[in-house]
Regions:
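Conserved active-site tyrosine of GNAT-family acetyltransferases
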Residues: 113-114, 118
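Active-site rim helix/loop that mediates acceptor-substrate recognition in acyltransferases
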Residues: 19-48, 52-53, 57
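Short hydrophobic/aromatic beta-strand element in the GNAT-like acyltransferase core
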Residues: 41-45, 55, 69, 102, ...
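A short beta-loop-alpha structural element at the N-terminal edge
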Residues: 2-14
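Conserved acetyl-CoA-binding loop-helix of GNAT-fold acetyltransferases
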Residues: 72, 78-91
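Conserved beta-strand in the GNAT
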Residues: 51-59, 66-71
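Conserved GNAT acetyl-CoA-binding A-motif
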Residues: 93-106
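Conserved catalytic-core motifs of GNAT/GCN5-like acyltransferases
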Residues: 102-104, 119-137
Length: 151
């Protein structure tokens, strides 16, 4: 299994994976999954034997960097693959000239992100099937909680 930054050729498959899982599990319409080029999306993915089994995206929206489209195939859940994917993506994101990311996270993801120094910025709210919690994570908080402050 490999966790890596996605390339342009991966985008269609990652959008299809996220769309299928989000629609099936959360009733989110597939039409909401794609990210237009003007949002400058970057993807990270989990790949095994040529199959993409997880992904997360960073994109520019409402004058801020936003992380979302986080998805892990059901057969990989509970094995900390999602945590490793987020760790890889966040390490790469904060190695760029990005100071903060915002996100709306499901409960499981909230717990992972808090370990990386994220904080909630509002109360959970309904989003299709279930709720999401608004969060933000700064570069400084990530490095302090994840690497002891060493860059």
């Amino acid at each position: 299994m490999q966790i890596r930054r996605g390339c342009e050729a991966d985008t269609e498959r990652l959008v299809a994976l996220a769309g299928q899982i989000f629609e099936t599990e959360q009733e989110i319409p597939r039409a909401l999954t794609p990210l237009p080029p003007e949002n400058r999306p970057q993807w990270w993915c989990v790949e095994e034997d040529g199959a993409l089994l997880g992904g997360v995206a960073l994109y520019w929206e409402d004058n801020a960097w936003h992380m979302g489209r986080f998805v892990i195939s059901p057969e990989l859940r509970g094995r900390h693959v999602g945590t490793a994917l987020l760790e890889t993506a966040l390490t790469d994101i904060f190695a760029q000239d990005i100071r903060e990311v915002t996100m709306e996270a499901r409960d499981t993801t909230v717990h992972i992100l808090k370990k990386f120094g994220a904080e909630t910025t509002g109360a959970p709210f309904s989003f299709y099937r279930g709720t999401v919690t608004p969060m933000r994570l700064t570069r400084e908080a990530f490095w302090n909680s994840h690497t002891g402050g060493q860059i």
